[in-house]
Amino acid sequence: MSRVTLSRYLIEQTRSNNTPADLRFLIEVVARACKAISHQVSKGALGGVLGSAGSENVQGEVQKKLDVLSNEILLEANEWGGHLAGMASEEMDNAYQIPGKYPKGAYLLVFDPLDGSSNIDVNVSVGTIFSVLRCPDACFSQNDALGEEAFLQPGTKQVAAGYAIYGPQTMLVLTLGHGVMGFTLDRELGSFVLTHENLCVPQSTAEFAINMSNQRHWEAPVQRYVGELLAGKEGPLGKNYNMRWIASMVADVHRILTRGGIFMYPRDAREPDKAGKLRLMYEANPMSMIIEQAGGAATTGTQRILEIQPQSLHQRVPVFLGSKEEVERVTGYHQG
């Protein structure tokens, strides 16, 4: 039986689920950009792209050279195709305007070009996260600049979401709202090939991912829940749990997606003015769509992430996502 490439899968989705052709083309362009980023990441020190770029992004985080390069790759790949009304990135303060010499399209692309880049110098898996929204008709113009308000849509409005993970293999994990598919990059063919069909998160688990060094700064419901996990078989949950933490959201969530578990990044008492660490629009929303499409759950502890009405492009939220049973338990502790 012939292998199913990403292009073939997307064409079949156009036939069976009425996926618009321009969305199909957009996903293919994003995938090509991810292949280019994968190539740069794999060069490591040989490519001269490791280390700091000597600048900070809008969050005040030091930008790595590969952050900047990955951002440029995604912008240049997507700006000219006529599928997008605008783009937004973790690495840019404001929305990216499609140059006037190119036509505009119906969609908005929001992305974290290189998630986990603080790990790049030590050769740990990193990735690209992206979200696709429709541009509201009221915000669309071929001639005028696109405002931030066009992007401020709840995650339920996403028409596609995905991530690429650059590890021992390069994988693209994608949802168009009809389940979650995993594609592995065949470097000989130069194509992403369908290798993981209809990914599902196990409902019950014995793994969790959280940065335990921050434990003293967590809110009481998180302290309670993690305490119960650590209590093991003798504790109230009646089983032993393993903790894993890579400090790369793509890598941590990919493990949760394939093996089950719960990923947690709660709010932190050291920064009471910030609701959390992870960004809603281009980290929490796309990952939540993927996890929910795979049968899991994703909340802030008090609210379903996909139902949050964004207030700003770089808004932060606490995140609890993964196996439904565990997410519902910790969410219940917050609400009780």
From Swiss-Prot:
Catalyzed reactions: beta-D-fructose 1,6-bisphosphate + H2O = beta-D-fructose 6-phosphate + phosphate
Chain positions recorded as Mg(2+) 1 binding sites: 90, 112, 114
Subcellular location: Cytoplasm
Classification via InterPro entries: FBPase_C_dom (IPR044015), FBPase_class-1 (IPR000146), FBPase_N (IPR033391), FBPtase (IPR028343)
Cytoplasm in keyword set: yes
Coiled coil (UniProt feature): none
Keywords from the UniProt entry: Carbohydrate metabolism, Cytoplasm, Hydrolase, Magnesium, Metal-binding
Recorded GO CC terms: cytosol
Family affiliation: Belongs to the FBPase class 1 family.
Subunit note: Homotetramer.
Protein name according to UniProt: Fructose-1,6-bisphosphatase class 1
